[in-house]
């Protein structure tokens, strides 16, 4: 995400790397480039100007230690101001109450329904809550069906009232249902609407007044840039929402919405969507996003995702096998499964400091795992447990290629990389994950 902006900012900040000290001249030259990079990233003009003015004031006003180079200082100031621009600190959602009520709002197609299910899944799996999804989009039958499918997928109850076309009534009845059956949180999925559609705006205002929600979350598509910011501003004037959800952030190479929306509407970004899977969204951490924009990675989020998928018993067993050099294809399958659970591979690798830039132009293909898995599943149980059987047997490789639908060259390549991984894992005795990044390239 934000690859174009990251590259431009890195080039801009290089101007100061060869300088001996900070001066008004070299700061002005650097920030001229920074401002242009922000504007090209579709950042609001006033926000970009305010940002560069603040960075200039702080950079020229700091007492610089002789050991700190001007380039390092400017990166520090830009990082801190980027984080401040996006809110400074992560802001949690309010789920107090019996039940807590969360009202979703936004344009049609912004991802409200999918996000409603993702939020329910997070509350269920990570907050030990019992959520209820309320289907209040009475204008689009497919939205109710979609919510039912997603609810079934994550094991969350969906409240519907077939035949009732009054969203306020449905929302109130959903809350009654929650109280009666012990649900902790009610998430109200509403119809998409335009801020200029007076009838629809009156409807969601009526829902707000009727249910007195803990949170009103406004969902916007980050890839629409300044349109997202302008829409959020119009909705906020009518609804006074409590937070913003940015969806489709994984496809946003510019970052204009993420960098502008907090300042323009003065409401925090609470979550960001990074894919279609139910766990493909994150709490928004402004400081970590600033790290990623400046090419520093996001090692904290990387470790958190890894820990979520960590199986202590499996790790102990694997460590013993690796110490004895017994790592086999069954273990390899388990490792692939753990890594797949962490999310989009390019996004995950981009969290590792220094890796984001290196993989920018590579086609990191999540589907490549399917080919590797197909090759392993095409092996006999004996071959999976005894990798050396494949070392010099061309007939076995031919059979695996035919059974998996892969070429013989791909099978040989996978075996070679598996052997390299096995040697590495024996040396580190399970201290690190295998380097599967190269196996994702196509």
Cite the ranges covered by each PLM segment:
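Residue-level signature of catalytic and energy-coupling elements of molecular machines
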Residues: 16, 42-44, 78, 107, ...
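Amphipathic alpha-helical interaction segments
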Residues: 29, 33, 50, 54, ...
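Conserved phosphate-handling catalytic cores of large alpha/beta enzymes
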Residues: 171-175, 179, 183, 195, ...
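Short, surface-exposed connector motifs at secondary-structure boundaries
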Residues: 126-132, 154-158, 184-186, 211-216, ...
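Long amphipathic alpha-helical segments used for membrane anchoring, targeting, substrate engagement
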Residues: 2-19, 288-442
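Primarily NTPase-proximal linker/entry elements flanking Walker-type ATP/GTP-binding cores
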Residues: 8-136, 143-164, 171-190
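Short, small-residue-enriched loops and turns at beta-alpha junctions
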Residues: 109-110, 139-141, 165-167, 192-196, ...
């Amino acid at each position: 995400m934000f690859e174009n902006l990251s590259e431009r900012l890195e080039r801009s900040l290089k101007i100061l790397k060869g300088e001996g000290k900070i001066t008004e001249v070299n700061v002005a030259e650097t920030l001229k480039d920074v401002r242009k990079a922000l504007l090209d990233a579709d950042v609001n003009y006033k926000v970009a100007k305010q940002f560069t003015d603040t960075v200039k004031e702080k950079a020229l006003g700091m007492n610089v230690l002789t050991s700190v180079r001007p380039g390092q200082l400017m990166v520090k100031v830009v990082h801190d101001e980027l984080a401040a621009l996006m809110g400074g600190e992560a802001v949690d959602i309010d789920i107090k109450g019996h039940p807590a009520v969360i009202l979703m709002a936004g344009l049609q197609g912004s991802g409200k329904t999918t996000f409603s299910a993702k939020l329910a899944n997070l509350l269920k799996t990570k907050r030990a809550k019992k959520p209820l999804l309320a289907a209040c989009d009475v204008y689009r039958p497919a939205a109710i069906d979609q919510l039912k499918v997603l609810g079934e997928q994550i094991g969350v109850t969906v409240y519907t009232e077939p035949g009732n076309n009054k969203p306020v009534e449905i929302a109130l009845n959903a809350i009654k249902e929650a109280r009666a059956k012990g649900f902790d949180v009610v998430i109200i999925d509403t119809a998409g609407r335009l801020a200029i559609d007076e009838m629809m705006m009156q409807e969601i205002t009526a829902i707000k007044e009727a249910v007195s929600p803990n949170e009103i979350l406004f969902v916007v598509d980050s890839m629409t840039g300044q349109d997202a910011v302008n829409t959020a501003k119009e909705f906020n004037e009518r609804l006074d929402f409590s937070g913003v959800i940015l969806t489709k952030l994984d496809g946003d190479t510019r970052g204009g919405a993420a960098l502008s929306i907090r300042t323009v509407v003065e409401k925090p970004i609470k979550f960001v969507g990074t894919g279609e899977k139910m766990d493909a969204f994150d709490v928004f951490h402004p400081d970590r996003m600033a790290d990623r924009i400046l090419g520093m990675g996001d090692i904290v989020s990387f470790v958190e995702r890894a820990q979520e998928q960590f199986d202590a018993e499996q790790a102990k067993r694997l460590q013993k096998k690796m110490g004895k050099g017994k790592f086999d294809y069954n273990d390899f399958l388990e490792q692939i499964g753990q890594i797949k659970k962490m999310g989009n591979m390019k996004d995950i690798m981009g969290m590792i400091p220094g890796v984001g830039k290196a993989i920018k132009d590579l086609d990191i293909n999540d589907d490549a795992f399917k080919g590797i898995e197909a090759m392993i599943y095409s092996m006999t149980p004996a071959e999976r447990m005894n990798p050396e059987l494949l070392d010099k047997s061309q007939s076995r490789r031919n059979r695996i290629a035919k059974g998996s639908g892969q070429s013989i060259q791909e099978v040989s390549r996978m075996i070679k990389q598996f052997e390299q991984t096995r040697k590495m894992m024996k040396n580190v005795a399970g201290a690190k994950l295998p380097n599967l990044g190269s196996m994702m390239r196509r």
